[in-house]
């Protein structure tokens, strides 16, 4: 007898507007429950303090979540000058207070120094994991663990507001930037200390900001479906982005269904017009059905790397 699945095979990406004070994993579990999804995974944790865009992959889309984890991000951050906390953010205790003698010109010159590529050691109060646990859990227990420096790139950083002791900035960066570190470093550059009071992720890859939904939105739709005696999927599934939206930045290789069938059985194929190397997004037929991610092998063929598993309708 086949083992009964826990959940349904729903596939796609939902853009959640994560609230503050909740972990990314807690958010993931709530979405998985609401969708009654068989599989779910997020695409890079946000610190509990942070709000904003958290793409959650459901079903087969989880196979491609790494591409979103590696993608560029956009943030809006507010820092308070003159106070340093033991966590580098407003959740911690103030451990040092200093006078703020900073003008806008000095601030803009310091901010400009963040642009470009540098090495950064992650903060102990970040959501990055060490041996399966977020760093901030170790930090709250007074334990410091080794962290390797990582290359980070800040493509742009703009000063939006400087009022009193508050500084608001907008940042476009690579995946590795640990945001609680940025205001801390800025504060030391200015000689007054600083910590994060507000952090919001406004963008991941090219996903539209306006497509975000809250957990409350999803719960309301679930309640509506129960009230109207409808299948929840009728109201919830239209909010999903296609699973290949996670790999939209990859070059597409479209192939005839006969070749796609070979690929889906693990065989590399020769496709006219394919790139000479690199990772590609594979589609089949005139309808451009997404079948997975491949790579160009040493013989110039398109070889499967991550494939979508298609199920018969009766399984759904």
Curated annotation (Swiss-Prot):
> What biological process terms from GO does the record include?
mRNA pseudouridine synthesis; tRNA pseudouridine synthesis
Catalytic center residues: 47
Which Pfam family, an example, fits this chain? Answer: TruB_N
Report the EC number(s), separated by commas if there are several. Answer: 5.4.99.25
Point out the coiled-coil segments of this chain. Answer: none
Task: Identify the InterPro entries for this entry.
Answer: PsdUridine_synth_cat_dom_sf (IPR020103), PsdUridine_synth_N (IPR002501), PUA-like_sf (IPR015947), PUA_sf (IPR036974), tRNA_psdUridine_synth_TruB (IPR014780), tRNA_sdUridine_synth_fam1_C (IPR015240), TruB_C (IPR032819)
- Classification via SUPFAM superfamilies: Pseudouridine synthase, PUA domain-like
Q: Which domain of life is it from?
A: Bacteria
The yes or no answer to whether the keyword Thylakoid is present is no
One annotated GO molecular function = RNA binding
Reactions listed under catalytic activity? uridine(55) in tRNA = pseudouridine(55) in tRNA
Q: What class of enzyme is it?
A: isomerase
For this UniProt record, give its keywords in alphabetical order, as a comma-separated list. Answer: Isomerase, tRNA processing
Transmembrane regions: none
Family classification: Belongs to the pseudouridine synthase TruB family. Type 1 subfamily.
Q: What does this protein do?
A: Responsible for synthesis of pseudouridine from uracil-55 in the psi GC loop of transfer RNAs.
**NCBIfam families tied to this protein:** TruB
Recorded protein name is tRNA pseudouridine synthase B
Q: Which gene encodes it?
A: truB
């Amino acid at each position: 007898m086949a083992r009964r699945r826990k959940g349904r095979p729903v596939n796609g990406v939902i853009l959640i507007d994560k609230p503050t004070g909740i972990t990314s994993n807690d958010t993931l579990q709530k979405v998985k429950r609401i969708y009654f999804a068989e599989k779910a995974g997020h695409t890079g944790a946000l610190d509990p303090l942070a709000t904003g865009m958290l793409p959650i992959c459901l079903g087969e889309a989880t196979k491609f979540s790494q591409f979103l984890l590696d993608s560029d991000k956009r943030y809006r951050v507010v820092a308070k000058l003159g106070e340093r906390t033991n966590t580098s953010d407003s959740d911690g205790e103030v451990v040092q207070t200093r006078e703020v003698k900073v003008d806008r010109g000095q601030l803009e010159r310091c901010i400009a120094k963040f642009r470009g590529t540098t090495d950064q050691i992650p903060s102990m109060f970040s959501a990055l994991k060490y041996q399966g646990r977020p760093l901030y859990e170790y930090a709250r227990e007074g334990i410091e663990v080794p962290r390797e420096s990582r290359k980070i790139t800040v493509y742009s950083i703009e000063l939006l507001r400087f009022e009193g002791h508050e500084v608001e900035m907008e940042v476009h960066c690579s995946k590795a930037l640990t945001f609680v570190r940025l205001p801390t470093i800025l504060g030391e550059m200015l000689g007054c200390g600083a910590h994060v009071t507000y952090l919001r992720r406004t963008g991941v890859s090219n996903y539209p900001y306006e497509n975000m939904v809250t957990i409350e939105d999803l719960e309301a739709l679930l309640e509506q479906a129960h009230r109207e005696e409808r299948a929840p999927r009728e109201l919830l599934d239209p909010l999903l982005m296609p699973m290949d939206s996670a790999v939209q930045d990859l070059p597409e290789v479209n192939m005839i269904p006969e070749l796609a069938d070979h690929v889906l059985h693990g065989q590399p194929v020769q496709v006219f017009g394919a790139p000479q190397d690199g990772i590609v997004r594979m589609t089949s037929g005139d309808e451009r059905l997404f079948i997975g991610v491949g790579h160009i092998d040493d013989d110039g063929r398109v070889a499967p790397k991550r494939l979508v598993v298609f199920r018969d309708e009766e399984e759904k």
